[in-house]
Amino acid sequence: MTTTLVTGANKGLGLETTRRLIAAGHTVYAGMRNLDTGDAARELGAIPVQLDVNEQDSVDKAIGSLPELDVLINNAAVVGPSWTLDDLDIEAMRIAFETNVFGMVRVIQAALPLLKRSSNPVMVNVGSGLGFPRALLDPEDDSFHGYMVPYASSKAAVITLTVQYAKNLPQMRINASDPGYTSTDLNSHKGHQTVTEGTDATVALALIGPDGPTGEYHGRKGRIEY
């Protein structure tokens, strides 16, 4: 049985990823800040675990509660209070980076000892086309072309960190996924994709074997070249 941890798993992309991986036979621990929001994940058969990626103690306790870990899905993210340069300030950048980047690294570092014991350790970091310069500059790309400066910058860091972890941990399969413009709370449900479509890349990467890709960036149609 494959044991998986999904962060931000109480709703949206995280909840749908949880549903699909349970259907694929995984035992899924659904990380969320507030266990009171865990009913939907629990009904799917997931095991809710209190996990605030911004709090080291919470992360340590969550990871410490896992018997083993084969797959880590870093999905938790926030937009933050700023969208354009007009209202951009350091605090807005800090809020986005605290959860989307520092929180991801906090979880990864805590989870590495468990992942290293797995016979097929896999990590998927959920990125965004907003953090991928080539997509932002491509008029044919269907990503949301809003500004969201702090969020976009943080997701660029997620993609780069994914490559760095993959280079430094060649025994693991570590990749980033691009959900595309998906209808979630994060964009007030304005996205044109369903959460199922938005989790296609994440789920596919979560299911790869030891000979699968690493250090890559994938959308729902496959690999996106850097």
Feature annotation, model-predicted:
Residues 10, 14-19:
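N-terminal Rossmann NAD(P)H-binding glycine-rich loop of SDR-like oxidoreductase domains
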Residues 24-39:
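Conserved glycine-rich Rossmann-like NAD(P)H-binding loop of the short-chain dehydrogenase/reductase
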Residues 43-57:
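Rossmann-fold cofactor-recognition segment
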Residues 54-68:
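Conserved Rossmann-fold cofactor-binding substructure of NAD(P)-dependent oxidoreductases
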Residues 73, 107-111, 115, 161-162, ...:
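Hydrophobic positions on the long internal alpha-helix
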Residues 78, 82, 86-97, 116-167:
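Catalytic loop of short-chain dehydrogenase/reductase
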Residues 156-159, 167, 171-172, 176-179, ...:
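C-terminal helical subdomain
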